[in-house]
Amino acid sequence: MELYDALRTTFAAREFTADPLPDDVLAKILDQARFAPSGGNRQGWRVIVVREPATKRSLGDLSAFAGRRYAAQAANGESPWNTIDPPRVDAATIERTPVPPHLTEAIATAPVVLVVCVDLKVVASIDQDLKRVGIISGASIYPFAWNILLAARHEGFGGTITTLATAREPEIKKLLGIPPHFAVCAVMPLGRAARTLFRLKRKPVAEFSKRERWDGPAFGR
């Protein structure tokens, strides 16, 4: 697949056919994804390939806690789980909010689920002393996760990067035997997408790009 086509058509697939994703194809996908950049080329990623139905169901169930709050905040017009604005919904509202099936069922029903982790001993968390949530470590793991989706798209498969289960990271670590110094970064269901989107909606360049300064004129169209 031509690169620009892949960039414009790799969507978040959450519904899959019954077609398997064979080990040899998955190995090819990971073989391409490993060429992602990482700080110092330390390549701190680790991947757990999950096919066992019970384990996939457990990972889906672990996504429900964060998914419930996500849905409650979204229904209240909030940006869910952001660290700037405190949630305006109370605990009781969150507790009685049903979890939208699309947030958890893909993990339980996908042919394969990848649990992507990163070694915290090798990533540079340069923003660790700032008075905000740390995000810089993600530069050494999420390009790898995105490469997985691009390579899967090239091979005729799809998936998505989900993070809801990470709110229950201790339980995931216990379930999968993950060492303490690793962080769980994503739970990625993969398979043959039940449908394909060819027209993704994104903001135009001029809405997010400025010249020279934050308050500079728009760049692009």
Model-identified regions with their sequence ranges:
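C-terminal helix-cap and adjacent tail motif
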Residues: A6, A12-A13, I84-D85, A183-R221
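Short catalytic-loop micro-motif centered on adjacent basic/acidic residues
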Residues: E15-F16, R46, G158-T162
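Small-aliphatic-rich amphipathic alpha-helix that forms the alpha element of a beta-alpha
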Residues: I29, A33, L114-K174
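Short, basic and Ser/Thr-rich N-terminal targeting/leader segments
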Residues: N41-G44, A108-A110, A183
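Short, conserved aromatic-histidine micro-motifs
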Residues: F65-R68, K174-L190
